[in-house]
């Protein structure tokens, strides 16, 4: 059986924070907020990265199916940057075939800051980057 998902290719950037960090940055605990590149960089400059992993809801589901034994693939758009490389390597490690046209993009690879407070609540700040710009030209139908 083969299953292919298409979605936003997002690198999850996991950081531990306290409630004060959320308040100081006007973030609502346990919510997800779409942010631009400027806000992403502003937040990231004040954080210590714990871990980065390939993410995005569709890709996460495809990885789960792969772990259950399905032959799985994912279509999503990343840039030819460090995070884009990390994203494709992460899917490969999970035995997910990744279909994409690797090229330099104007926008960087999409990222989601996952801010974890001491009570294990997650607050997410997502910058879609190039993931939000996927189009027909990015999909290789012959693959």
Give residue spans per PLM region.
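Active-site cofactor/substrate anionic-group-binding motifs, chiefly glycine-
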Residues: 46, 73, 79-80, 97-100
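Short, electropositive alpha-helical surface patch
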Residues: 80, 85-92
